[in-house]
Amino acid sequence: MLPGAAGASFEFWPAMDAFVKLDDRFRLYFTAAFVRGMEPDATSGEEIYRDVTFGAHLDLTLKPIFRPRLRTSDWERQRYVWVRAGYRYGTTIGEVADPFEEHRGLLEQTGRAPLPSAFWLVERSRLEFRDVDDTSSTRLRFRLTCEREMPIGGRETIPYVNGELYYDFRADALKRQRYQSGVEVILTHRWRIEPYFSYQVEMHSDDEDVAALGLNFKYYR
């Protein structure tokens, strides 16, 4: 069992992502993500909260070396090194006890390396410049993913597991760990779906740990 699992709250994380290829080096990425959960409330006992995040990003290939024997046409998995710059806006929906508003700029780098038995190791480093309720902070996120392409039930799929660390420069401390397992299922040339389970450990906070089911819909053009 992960640390604090017995006292974790549960959330649902649906999202819609759209990827627009501009050429062999550039791609646009848009996202709309939703969070639904429950937290204790002094008057009503429990309160449902809903958060929403919108984002726009530009992806750029740094090392466009195409992988051999790739089953499916995939912009990011065909590239060994690429970077992303973007902006995200997040806020609560409706009246809640603890509303928030966040503006977030981000820069990230993703690299891929082959492993034995057709597995791949994917490293992502992300620097986030956050303004949450007029309070500024900078956060570094480092994620390692292990994935493998394989056919399941007549469809190409990409099962994966990953772990991620969050470092807050303002607190000068590791603030969060996140562990995730899921599978990306290729439905058509343009559509994919990604169900997953995620567990989030809060390391230096009174906030509860979070267990979440996620469902991403992905559109490629």
Give residue ranges: language-model regions.
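Outer-membrane beta-barrel domain signature
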Residues: L2-G7, D41-E47, G94-F100, D131-T135, ...
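Detector for outer-membrane/organellar transmembrane beta-barrel domains
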Residues: R104-L106, T110-Y166
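Transmembrane beta-strands of outer-membrane beta-barrel pores
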Residues: G4, A32-M38, Y87-I93, A113, ...
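Short glycine/proline- and aromatic-enriched beta-strand/turn motifs that initiate or cap beta-hairpins
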Residues: M1-E46
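Repeated loop/turn-to-beta-strand initiation elements of outer-membrane beta-barrel proteins
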Residues: D24-F30, K63-R69, Y80-V83, P116-L121, ...
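Residues that define the transmembrane beta-barrel architecture of outer-membrane proteins
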Residues: F10-F12, I48-F54, E101-G105, S136-F142, ...
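Hydrophobic/aromatic-rich structural module bridging two neighboring secondary-structure elements via a short loop
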Residues: S44-T110
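Outer-membrane beta-barrel "beta-signal"
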Residues: L60-T61, Q109, D209-R221
